[in-house]
Amino acid sequence: MKILITGRPGVGKTTLIKKLSRLLQNAGGFYTEEMREDGKRIGFKIITLDGEEGILARTDLPSPYRVGKYYVNLKDLEEIGVRSLERAFQEKDLIIIDEIGKMELLSRKFREVVEKIFDSEKDVVATIKKSSDPFVEKIKNRNDVVIFELNEKNRNSLLNEILSVLKFNRGEKQ
């Protein structure tokens, strides 16, 4: 089962992913978290489900890769994020990806491992931007993908809905 969670920025996609990852057995992968200084967002951390942490992007990072005001750290993305996806692919039943977005898509290695994961039999829960990027559209338009749109109205019920779908797909009792 391949589940994509989409929704506007700030609606709670990462919060939902973090809750799911705590509740689901044998999951691997990563999520991203805002970095704030004096109340202002200055970047994003990448955090693996097994506790590794790095910097995905910052406003003051020396990097040739840029998305908006953020300079993207491909080194940490690939050495921490991509590596966590490769480990999860080898060792886990469920792969968590937060997110398949503009910053992450700057990495060829990230795109390759995401394609490999989506082409496999592995279960996936990923957040994905509402985007017209060809790679994103290709993932969203797969026959084996179920897309959930997170919003203020379903924010509290979507967790249980996704858990039910995953459990049903895995043949577990509700």
UniProtKB/Swiss-Prot annotation:
Its EC number is 3.6.1.15. InterPro entries: AAA+_ATPase, Nuc-triphosphatase_THEP1, P-loop_NTPase. Keywords: ATP-binding, Hydrolase, Nucleotide-binding. Transmembrane segments: none annotated. It holds the Pfam family NTPase_1. It catalyses: a ribonucleoside 5'-triphosphate + H2O = a ribonucleoside 5'-diphosphate + phosphate + H(+). CDD domains: RecA-like_Thep1 (cd19482). One of its GO terms (molecular function) is ATP hydrolysis activity. ATP binds at residues 7-14, 94-101. It comes from the Bacteria. Belongs to the THEP1 NTPase family. Has nucleotide phosphatase activity towards ATP, GTP, CTP, TTP and UTP. May hydrolyze nucleoside diphosphates with lower efficiency. PANTHER family: CANCER-RELATED NUCLEOSIDE-TRIPHOSPHATASE. This is Nucleoside-triphosphatase THEP1. It comes from Thermotoga sp. (strain RQ2).
